[in-house]
């Protein structure tokens, strides 16, 4: 997992997840968008794309039933969302254990500013915790430029 919304296999992005909260008189709702590279091959893509992305097909040489995949994805999302209240801290510990940034030096572009530091993980608000220049930065948005 690469904060804020990428799912990686090795160093290659296979999925992106965007979540937006919407509030109305009827209550709050989450709008969740998932983009998953499934049955496409990136073999013919430009070299810069192949360096940072992959697909399930490229990894397994097998196609998947997209309807079954969608059903399973929805089941897993429902399960995870229902566990958020009772297991929130546990789930963030799990998230940090699979984050490719935790325990590494990271550079994040936030607007015109480049913020670099040692990543302590992701807090319960979803902020990336970077320790740089003697202070802890809590980033709620940005683009990860590099990590090493």
For each predicted feature, which ranges?
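Conserved N-terminal catalytic core of the sugar/cofactor nucleotidyltransferase
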Residues: 1-2
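Conserved active-site carboxylates
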Residues: 6
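Long, positively charged amphipathic alpha-helical accessory segments at protein N-termini or as interdomain linkers
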Residues: 9-148
């Amino acid at each position: 997992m690469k904060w804020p919304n990428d799912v990686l296999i090795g160093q290659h992005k296979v999925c992106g997840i965007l979540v937006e909260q919407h509030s109305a008189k009827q209550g709050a709702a989450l709008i969740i968008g998932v983009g998953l590279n499934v049955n496409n091959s990136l073999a013919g893509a430009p070299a810069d794309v192949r360096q940072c992305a992959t697909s399930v097909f490229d990894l397994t040489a097998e196609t998947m039933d997209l309807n079954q995949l969608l059903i399973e994805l929805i089941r897993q999302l429902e399960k995870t969302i229902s566990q958020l209240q009772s297991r929130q801290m546990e789930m963030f510990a799990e998230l940090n254990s699979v984050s490719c940034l935790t325990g590494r030096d990271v550079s994040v572009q936030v607007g015109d500013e480049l913020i670099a530091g040692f990543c302590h993980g992701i807090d319960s608000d979803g902020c990336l915790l970077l320790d740089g220049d003697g202070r802890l930065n809590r980033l709620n948005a940005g683009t990860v430029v590099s990590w090493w």
